[in-house]
Curated annotation (Swiss-Prot):
Its EC number is 1.8.1.2. This is Sulfite reductase [NADPH] hemoprotein beta-component. GO terms for molecular function: 4 iron, 4 sulfur cluster binding; heme binding; metal ion binding; NADP binding; sulfite reductase (ferredoxin) activity; sulfite reductase (NADPH) activity. It comes from Myxococcus xanthus (strain DK1622). Keywords: 4Fe-4S, Amino-acid biosynthesis, Cysteine biosynthesis, Heme, Iron, Iron-sulfur, Metal-binding, NADP, Oxidoreductase. Its cofactor is siroheme; [4Fe-4S] cluster. PROSITE patterns: NIR_SIR. [4Fe-4S] cluster binds at residues 428, 434, 473, 477. The keyword Oxidoreductase applies. GO terms for cellular component: sulfite reductase complex (NADPH). Pfam families: NIR_SIR, NIR_SIR_ferr. It comes from the Bacteria. It is an enzyme of class 1 (oxidoreductase). Binds 1 siroheme per subunit. Binds 1 [4Fe-4S] cluster per subunit.
Length: 562
């Protein structure tokens, strides 16, 4: 009996016919009849760094009025390692006020997002981003996304070297099509000879995420990435990277064939082999990823189903050289270090806490204005963290008092007073703009944290470094499956409760309760907090406790898909 191959997903056909990501984007942008794009172009624009969205708070009202959805666009920058200059910050600040919803958002991939950009403003907004020596190319889509890197230059000069490798990886894996420059920047079409040497005409089966980590901090959650480079430092020198492959957070409710997965460390390489390894890992995803089912298309499923030994052998065959054995390393924490720290060169770095990465002017908290004023006098740079916070980096000793005064005057000093659970918490955007959200996340986080703080305080745990993450759907943009307490949206006001991750980003959590509301979540946590307060060992985190006490399975017995 012959087996017919499964049909390709619809997006694969769109990419095939797109002429290297051009599609009919130019025509869609000029169409005055609608605030949206032609359906195929809504997929293609992701590669250019944007998502078409609509305001779900008014979707039903507009439907009843026989109006099209209230379309707008989210724009995301490509900003390797999250480093930007004060001048670039001021450009993003101006665009947020002129063309977006008067807010900036720092993402869990160290990038800026603008929300609420209307179709007619897309071209001028993208043009100004490019004029500021940034871009949005490959910030979304079936390509390598923004490359993460430890954002804080405190520890050593090696951190700057590692950051430069993150930039080189990002540039090396950038799509080569001229479509972006033609559609958005008015560049002339070049006749013939265009190809995609790494991606091919249909790019990857799904998104690809890469990160560079510098132990002992795992602030980029390297094991949640498709590809990770873990810096190995001996003395004051970078000697190479351990390579990790096959991580990913996304899953689908009710589909056992989809699941979060931690990456596997497959070996060690010297720095000069970094770009070759990055390219060949991407090509393996290109050639073996599932193009028939986008929910099953990430690289992690290739490793899970074919096995790590197969993957390593395939990678070494393509490279033409073997990987060396992985070298020892240790992670201590995956959070940020708040407040002032002095760097190796005598300059100072101030890490600010931002709720869910949102920079806005709110009553009593004019953060957007405050950071604008800081950018006008700052001579160092800004570093966006993968925990949605911000480092004002490279502050001279002479400027420290002035920067500190602006921070205080604009209520940017919450890192001093916020509880550890509030400082460490992450949330995705979710409603009202994300089309995938099943429940609230960013808008709900402050309320839930407040109630959680009350329960922790009742048990004397107000200083516990609890790691909480909330996402509005199971795709896991805020990496909830690595949290000690993770809420994953299931329906309006209802979440799956995951417990048992750790504060090092090295252990997946376990589903503890399914489809429950806030009261039930707090009721489920109450006896665990009581036990943790009574029985925890010195230095033991909450996630470690719930595993040790048997409330959730340990990783050794946690079921894995077969």
């Amino acid at each position: 009996m012959s087996h017919q191959p499964k049909p390709l997903s619809e997006v694969e056909h769109i990419k095939t016919q797109s002429r290297l990501l051009r599609g009919s984007l130019a025509e869609s942008l000029e169409d005055p009849v609608t605030g949206g794009l032609a359906t195929p172009d809504t997929n293609l624009i992701k590669f250019h760094g944007s998502y078409q969205q609509d305001d779900r708070d008014v979707r039903e009202e507009r439907r009843q009025q026989k109006l099209e959805p209230d379309y707008s666009f989210m724009l995301r920058t490509r900003l390797p390692g999250g480093v930007c200059t004060p001048a670039q910050w001021l450009v993003m600040d101006a665009l947020a006020r002129e063309h977006a919803n008067h807010t900036l958002r720092i993402t869990t991939r160290q990038a800026f997002q603008l929300h609420g950009v209307i179709k007619d403003d897309l071209r001028p907004t993208i043009a100004r981003i490019n004029e500021a020596m940034m871009d949005t190319l490959a910030a979304c889509g079936d390509v390598n996304r923004n490359v993460l890197c430890n954002p804080n230059p405190v520890d050593s000069r090696v951190h700057e070297t590692v950051y430069q490798w993150a930039v080189r990886i990002s540039e090396h894996l950038l799509p080569k099509t001229r479509a972006y420059y033609e559609v958005w920047l008015g560049k002339e079409k070049v006749a013939g000879g265009e190809d995609e040497p790494i991606y091919g005409a249909t790019y990857l089966p799904r998104k690809f995420k890469a990160a560079v980590a510098v132990p002992p901090l795992n602030d980029v959650d390297v094991f949640a990435q498709d590809l990770g480079f873990i810096a190995i430092i001996e003395g004051d020198a970078l000697v190479g990277f351990n390579v990790s492959v096959g991580g990913g957070m996304g899953a689908t409710h009710g589909d056992a064939a989809t699941y979060p997965r931690l990456a596997d460390v497959v070996g060690f390489i010297p720095p000069e082999q970094t770009l070759a390894v990055a390219e060949e890992v991407v090509k393996i995803h290109r050639d073996f990823g599932d193009r028939t089912n986008r929910k099953h298309a990430r690289l992690k499923y290739v490793l899970e189903e074919r096995g790590v030994p197969w993957f390593t052998a395939e990678l070494e065959k393509r490279l033409g050289f073997p990987l060396q054995p992985a070298r020892p390393f240790a992670f201590e924490h995956n959070g940020d270090r708040f407040g002032w720290t002095e760097g190796h060169d005598g300059r100072w770095h101030l890490t600010l806490h931002l709720d869910s990465g949102r920079v806005a002017d709110r009553p009593g908290a004019p953060h957007l204005t405050g950071l604008r004023e800081i950018a006008r006098i700052h001579t160092g740079d800004f570093r966006l963290t993968a925990n949605q916070n911000l480092v004002i980096a490279g502050v001279t000793p002479e400027a420290r008092d002035a920067i500190g005064a602006l921070v205080t005057a604009h209520a940017l000093d919450s890192f001093r007073s916020a509880s550890p659970v509030r400082r460490n918490a992450l949330a995705c955007v979710a409603l009202p703009t994300c089309g995938l959200a099943m429940a609230e996340a960013e808008r709900y986080l402050p309320t839930f944290v407040g109630r959680l703080e009350d329960r922790l305080r009742a048990h004397g745990l107000q200083d516990a470094n609890l790691l909480l993450r909330i996402t509005g759907c199971p795709n896991g943009c805020a990496r909830p499956y690595l949290a000690e307490v993770g809420l994953v949206g299931k329906a309006p006001g209802r979440y799956n409760l995951h417990l048992g991750g750790d504060a090092r980003g090295q252990r997946l959590s376990h589903l503890y309760r399914e489809n429950i509301d806030e009261d039930a979540i707090l009721a489920a946590l109450e006896p665990l907090f009581e036990g943790y307060a009574r029985e925890r060992q010195p230095g033991e985190g909450f996630g470690d406790f719930v595993v040790r006490a048997g409330h959730v399975p340990s990783p050794a017995v946690q079921p894995r898909p077969s």
